[in-house]
Swiss-Prot record:
<dbReference type="InterPro" id="IPR004017">
    <property type="entry name" value="Cys_rich_dom"/>
</dbReference>
<comment type="similarity">
    <text>Belongs to the LutA/YkgE family.</text>
</comment>
<dbReference type="GO" id="GO:0016491">
    <property type="term" value="F:oxidoreductase activity"/>
</dbReference>
<dbReference type="GO" id="GO:0005829">
    <property type="term" value="C:cytosol"/>
</dbReference>
<dbReference type="InterPro" id="IPR022822">
    <property type="entry name" value="LutA"/>
</dbReference>
<dbReference type="Pfam" id="PF02754">
    <property type="entry name" value="CCG"/>
</dbReference>
<dbReference type="GO" id="GO:0006089">
    <property type="term" value="P:lactate metabolic process"/>
</dbReference>
<protein>
    <recommendedName>
        <fullName>Lactate utilization protein A</fullName>
    </recommendedName>
</protein>
<comment type="function">
    <text>Is involved in L-lactate degradation and allows cells to grow with lactate as the sole carbon source.</text>
</comment>
């Protein structure tokens, strides 16, 4: 199957290893991966701030960038969710709405794609330790990808997956929310870290780099010895096992 990678801004700028891991794993699973060079930001920061006309410009660029793609896959539930918003952006423009719907229908978050499209839950990954999952808000509440990450992690040899207390709570990032409401955001991520500690996990696993960067920053500030890792890094055997704490 031919797959086009939508890398996302945070992966492209800060977490390139996540993008590389995504490509490597998809290729191991039999996919042919390309990278449409015209892709830029999905427009989510502008959209969340109320700049919908500016968002349309970004959306049109992305629609054109992936128009020839068979399937689009991204290592982010948040950015994939933004693609799903595109048809509504063009509700008063039938031509662009149809093109936006075509893109939305063929775009998947990477774990969702592996489980629901490829039909794979065991990718042959190995990692010793205990992991807990942070189910990001956009990934679960908006995209509806609730079970795929756990299905994949539960098949990782040597890894025990435990439930995160209050797992449904937001980590406090929320894009521009973390800037505009920094005090509230700080309290929210502190609560998330408390829950991670309570879980006893060695690894905090997520599917959105934005949440992981936010949580990892607070883990480091508080001196908590837990690794915050993107799920694709575990599935691609890129995470070094922790030593006994």
């Amino acid at each position: 199957m031919k797959v086009s990678l939508f890398s996302t801004c945070l992966v492209d700028v800060f977490e390139k290893r996540v993008g590389i891991a995504t490509v490597e794993l998809l290729e191991k699973l039999g996919c042919e991966v390309d990278f449409p060079a015209a892709q830029v930001c999905c427009g989510q920061p502008a959209y969340n701030s109320g700049y919908h006309e500016e968002t349309k410009k970004a959306a049109k660029n992305m629609i054109k960038a992936f128009e020839q793609s068979e399937v689009v896959v991204a290592p982010s539930g948040s950015c994939v969710t933004m693609f799903k918003h595109y048809p509504d952006l063009f509700k008063n423009d039938a031509k662009w709405q149809a093109r936006a719907q075509e893109l939305a229908d063929k775009t998947y978050e990477v774990t969702q794609f592996i489980v629901e499209v490829l039909g794979i839950t065991n990718v042959g990954a190995k990692l010793d330790g205990v992991a807990t999952i942070h189910p990001s808000c956009h990934m679960t509440r908006l995209l509806g990808n609730v079970t795929a990450p756990a299905k994949l992690l539960n098949e990782v040899e040597g890894l025990e997956v435990v439930e995160l207390p209050k797992y449904y709570n937001c980590c406090g990032f929320g894009g521009t929310f973390a800037v505009k409401m920094s005090d509230v955001s700080g309290e929210m991520v502190d609560e998330k870290v408390d829950c991670i500690v309570e879980s006893g996990a060695d690894y905090l696993v997520g599917g959105d780099c934005s949440c992981l960067m936010n949580i990892d920053g607070r883990l480091r500030r508080r001196g908590v010895d837990v690794k915050a890792v993107h799920i694709i890094e575990i599935l691609n055997n890129q995470v070094e096992a922790v030593t006994t704490r």
